[in-house]
């Protein structure tokens, strides 16, 4: 376990034989205090933070998951992994699987066929901000850049109340609201799930690969490595030509990842701070919202050259200009130099905004808000004939968009809202052709400065009252979400669904253990969102559904795992009722005792941090915790051109004349 510490591993560069990585995970409630305030968190195997998953290209990942929460269903999404022809392993509840009920188990199994920086998290409402999240790093046997060692840093916003409470508050505030409501404020920013406790041990004249993973719920993060040269070399699993950041700062939206090369100094004269700040523009300025007295959006980590020397304060960073102070990810060039996808076959426009529906504020795509289907959308597609599966009306209120195999698809997202939205696509990376600055206006058919080799990623921040243009090739049959990655907005329907390559999708089969968890909800796999299962014609002409056992629906399955009825019926109320993951600190020169006690039993000081949070905030004592371990966080293991207005469109897929617009 790594309570808010950076952990560094060395790994031997060279050939590594492919292997099976078998993990047994029990999803449980754990009492933890990442910023000194004790609260229930969702952990794995009675520990929190959740473990990092390290793998090598070519491995096979096998994760057996048991839901030991007792009072919530769950599931695991592998964020950024395309799951080519293994769409049932995407882990999106009511999209590619039924939610995993308390006391039940299921397996995720897929080939590790992508390299780079990813993460895993629950796709059940509100669970990953409650702690069910962790990095997933896949090492490349032949990286395009040389480096000596590597670290992983996660960035997140943290809350003192559980999400179930905050979501109820957020929903209550939306009743009668005309233009959306203010999201609940976080209590702290965390680096590696700790507040002002993370240190990276470094040596002079070395180059380190640092994976940055924004696992947050709402605001983006800005990170600064004081007085060090850094170059961006990877975004969202794509190696890019090295891009020196120079005086620009790194900003990551929720769900985004980035890897940098950091060159260390040639001496050990001093240590250096790493400054991380939650995006105050998103939380306050774009919402015309006052900053509460005492609110602290920042946290600090350190590059430690000499443990005997002091840890300096964070660098003095004043106001940030969103138009000029950050590295623009559109300048990155994929190391593969993959060319711009041209001749667009299908253009999809998302006009996104907020409106009133049934007396409450909701988000919409083209006037429609996403509503969870009664059964997973993938199962609906698999149970239909290939012809019927192309009928968008089959899928209910999931904002479905059907695309056919091999099509070049262009998605235009017009953000009619006054704040930023990070959009994530499952099953793909997309090329980013264009993204405006804040208040940059909506897409009018014109492009400006389109790269001939656009950056590829799976999560993009779309600016307030602006737009973004994305392209991908539909070569991954399945059902894939495309959604805002702010959990508050997902609860209010800011989600779409891609029904991709319906004719080829029927080659996908649903594992038996995935089928067995559906009867727990009385949800048959197959049929339409509101009908019982039915036999559907298969491409080979055979009748019936080979994905599902040929027995009456609801009949007990003797091979199904027994339900565990001993689970608690709710979240424990005190630390004594939880598994205690911290224990006594081990005697080790590398791991001094924790500088704080994860408990709220002591009399807390007056809580002036934010009035809406309960009392019990225990200040964290200054000073880092440093640990070396074979577990968790660490382990080594452009040319821009204007392509013109059409930029690959056939004449009937876009409007406008000649020339380039000024959006950037």
From Swiss-Prot:
Extract the InterPro entries matched here. Cu-oxidase-like_N, Cu-oxidase_2nd, Cu-oxidase_C, Cu-oxidase_fam, Cu_oxidase_CS, Cu_oxidase_Cu_BS, Cupredoxin, CuRO_2_Fet3-like
Q: Name one Pfam family in it.
A: Cu-oxidase_3
Listed under GO cellular component are:
cell surface; extracellular region; high-affinity iron permease complex
- Tell me its family: Belongs to the multicopper oxidase family.
List where in the cell it is found. Secreted; Cell surface
Q: What is its main location?
A: secreted
Query: Where, by residue number, does Cu cation 3 bind?
Result: 123, 426, 483
Q: Which PANTHER family does this chain map to?
A: IRON TRANSPORT MULTICOPPER OXIDASE FET3, MULTI-COPPER OXIDASE
Q: Does the keyword Metal-binding apply?
A: yes
Q: Which residues are glycosylated?
A: 26, 71, 113, 205, 298, 388, 391, 449
Identify the residues that bind Cu cation 2: 79, 121, 485
Annotated protein name in UniProt: Multicopper oxidase abr1
Mind giving the lineage of the organism this protein is from?
Answer: Eukaryota, Fungi, Dikarya, Ascomycota, Pezizomycotina
The UniProt disruption phenotype note reads:
Changes the gray-green conidial pigment to a brown color.
Superkingdom field: Eukaryota
């Amino acid at each position: 376990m790594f309570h808010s510490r950076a952990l560094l591993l060395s790994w031997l560069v060279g050939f590594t034989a492919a292997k099976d990585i078998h993990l047994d995970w029990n999803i449980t409630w754990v009492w933890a205090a990442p910023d000194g305030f004790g609260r229930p968190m969702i952990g794995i195997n009675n520990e929190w933070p959740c473990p990092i998953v390290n793998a090598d290209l070519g491995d096979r990942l096998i994760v057996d998951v048991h839901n030991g929460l007792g009072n919530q269903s769950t599931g695991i999404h592998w964020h950024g992994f395309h799951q080519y022809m293994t769409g049932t392993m995407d882990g999106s509840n009511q999209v590619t699987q039924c939610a995993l009920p308390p006391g039940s188990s299921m397996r995720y199994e897929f080939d590790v066929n992508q390299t780079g920086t990813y993460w895993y998290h629950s796709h059940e409402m509100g669970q990953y901000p409650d702690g069910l999240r962790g990095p997933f790093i896949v090492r490349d046997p032949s990286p395009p850049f040389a480096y000596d060692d590597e670290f992983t840093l996660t960035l997140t916003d943290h809350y003192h109340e559980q999400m179930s409470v905050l979501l109820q508050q957020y929903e209550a505030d939306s009743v009668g609201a005309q233009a959306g409501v203010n999201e609940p404020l976080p209590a702290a920013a965390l680096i590696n799930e700790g507040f002002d406790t993370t240190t990276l041990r470094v040596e002079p004249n070395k180059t380190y690969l640092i994976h940055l993973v924004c696992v947050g719920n709402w605001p983006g993060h800005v990170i600064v490595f004081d007085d060090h040269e850094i170059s961006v070399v990877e975004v969202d699993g794509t190696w890019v030509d090295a891009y020196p950041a120079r005086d620009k700062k790194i900003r990551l939206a929720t769900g985004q990842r980035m890897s940098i090369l950091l060159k260390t100094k040639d001496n050990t004269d001093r240590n250096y701070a790493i400054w991380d700040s939650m995006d105050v523009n998103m939380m306050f300025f774009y919402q015309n919202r006052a900053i509460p007295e005492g609110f602290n959006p920042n946290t600090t980590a350190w590059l430690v050259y000499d443990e005997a020397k002091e840890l300096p304060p964070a660098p003095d960073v004043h106001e940030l200009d969103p138009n000029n102070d950050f590295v623009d990810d559109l300048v990155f060039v994929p190391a593969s130099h993959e060319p711009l996808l041209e001749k667009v076959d299908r253009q999809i426009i998302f006009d996104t905004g907020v409106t009133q529906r049934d007396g409450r504020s909701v988000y919409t795509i083209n006037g429609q808000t996403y509503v969870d289907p009664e059964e997973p959308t993938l199962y609906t597609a698999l149970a239909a004939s290939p012809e019927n599966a192309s009928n968008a009306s089959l899928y209910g209120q999931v904002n479905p968009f059907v695309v056919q195999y091999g099509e070049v698809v262009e998605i235009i997202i017009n953000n009619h809202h006054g704040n930023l939205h990070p959009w994530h696509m499952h099953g793909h990376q997309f090329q980013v052709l264009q993204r405006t600055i804040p208040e940059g206006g909506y897409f009018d058919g014109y492009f400006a400065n389109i790269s001939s080799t656009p950056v590829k990623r799976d999560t993009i921040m779309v600016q307030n009252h602006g737009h973004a243009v994305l392209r991908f090739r539909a070569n991954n049959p399945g059902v894939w979400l495309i959604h805002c990655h702010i959990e508050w907005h997902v609860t209010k329907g800011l989600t779409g669904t891609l029904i991709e390559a319906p004719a080829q999708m029927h080659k996908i089969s649903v594992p038996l253990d995935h089928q067995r968890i559906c009867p727990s909800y009385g949800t048959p796999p197959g049929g339409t969102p509101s009908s019982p299962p039915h036999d559907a014609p298969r491409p080979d002409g055979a009748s019936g559904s080979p994905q599902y056992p040929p027995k009456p629906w609801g009949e007990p399955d003797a091979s199904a795992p027994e339900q565990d009825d001993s689970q608690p019926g709710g979240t424990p109320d005190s630390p004594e009722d939880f598994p205690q993951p911290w224990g006594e600190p081990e005697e080790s020169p590398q791991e001094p005792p924790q500088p704080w006690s994860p408990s709220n039993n002591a009399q807390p000081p007056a809580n002036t941090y934010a009035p809406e949070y309960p009392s019990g905030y225990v200040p964290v004592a200054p000073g880092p915790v440093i640990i070396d371990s074979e577990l968790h966080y660490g382990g080594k293991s452009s040319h821009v051109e204007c392509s013109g207005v059409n930029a690959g469109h056939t004449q009937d897929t876009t409007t406008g004349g000649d020339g380039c617009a000024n959006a950037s």
